[in-house]
Amino acid sequence: GKIVTLIGSNGAGKSTTLKTIAGLVKPKSGSITFNGEPLLGKSTDQIVSRGVTLVPEGRRVFAQLSVLDNLKLGAFTRKDKEEIEETLLRVYKRFPRLEERKNQMAGTLSGGEQQMLAMGRALMSHPKIILMDEPSMGLSPIFVSEIFDIIREVSEGGTTVLLVEQNAKKALSIADRGYVLETGN
């Protein structure tokens, strides 16, 4: 997979672009296709089923659910139980802290651990492309480096990453391509 980063000033439309691709925002005009199939008019679960998943800004974990339950929610569109278990094992291998804390409530995790959980939950859907919105926001420098290493690993594993990130230097250092959004119009 490739890593493509969108950079630009606040209000340029980076997050809106990701939300629109994910089906959370309806565009005023234009079209969105993925692997030759139109995404406009599809429900979010249909979009996830086609291999597109979003790791939202601010992580958005389900605080009152366990780490394991959060991860299982990422596979809600999948029906292949054995494959889901194999994916869960791969997620635990990539994020050992999540396995150690699988019965812990997600709301009690640190910011970096919550980001790992959000990324792991996205990987549970077995995506072809992950839309990542500000994954390093609010994290300590050690977690930022770890998150960017994981993004690179995900890409090397064959999944494309569309990355929105304020840390332009770090994002461009791992990106195969970078695009600048100038205005929000």
Predicted segments — roles?
Residues G1-N185:
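Glycine-rich phosphate-binding loops of nucleotide-dependent enzymes
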